[in-house]
């Protein structure tokens, strides 16, 4: 008899919570259905071939060879129950040697009406936190992190010229908390290879 009573009590406590989850909100107004804005990063979904440009370090080699031209791939998948995108960015030098591998989770924050991202620099074991917002057909992102030499930086980036077959990305960096900026610290031109990226 006591077992039956415990089961009935457990069912009474669990069923209302499960029922509200099916209708998009749960206890305390928790929203479980992603809003329309959670699709703003959908342009990134798929597989991309990249042309990457970074400023040359200067000196004689830079005058002779010019700005280094790098290549890469960017793969992205919808995820997080419709709330965001998971992506992987790989950059290699002209000989195919790996230079950078990052893995990012981008989730729409319905309360802040913007994006929150966490990016892991795999080779350097560094994590960068950022935010983003969709404005005038561009995705604008800001972040704080540590560069390959261990210097703290602030970055501002934008995804622009977004079409079904391509997009461009530019990241500017500041090493002094945003007082001065190196514009175009990274420039990427992406061309779609596939609508769905393999894992």
Can you say where each PLM-predicted feature lies in the sequence?
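Bacterial N-terminal signal peptides
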Residues: 4-16
């Amino acid at each position: 008899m006591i077992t039956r009573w415990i089961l009935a009590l457990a069912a009474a406590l669990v069923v209302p919570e499960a029922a509200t989850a099916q209708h998009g909100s749960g206890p305390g107004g928790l929203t479980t259905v992603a809003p329309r804005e959670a699709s703003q990063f959908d342009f990134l979904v798929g597989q991309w071939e990249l042309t990457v440009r970074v400023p040359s370090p200067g000196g004689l080699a830079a005058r002779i060879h010019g700005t280094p031209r790098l290549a890469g791939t960017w793969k992205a998948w919808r995820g997080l129950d419709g709330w965001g995108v998971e992506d992987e960015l790989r950059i290699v030098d002209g000989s195919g040697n790996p230079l950078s591998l990052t893995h990012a989770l981008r989730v729409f924050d319905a309360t802040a009406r913007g994006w929150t991202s966490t990016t892991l620099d795999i080779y350097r074991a560094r994590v960068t936190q950022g935010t983003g917002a969709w404005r005038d057909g561009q995705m604008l992102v800001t972040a704080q992190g540590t560069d390959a030499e261990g210097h703290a930086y602030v970055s501002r980036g934008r995804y622009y010229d977004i079409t079904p077959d391509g997009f461009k990305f530019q990241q500017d960096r500041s090493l002094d908390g945003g007082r001065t900026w190196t514009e175009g610290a990274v420039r990427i031109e992406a061309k779609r290879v596939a609508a769905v990226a393999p894992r």
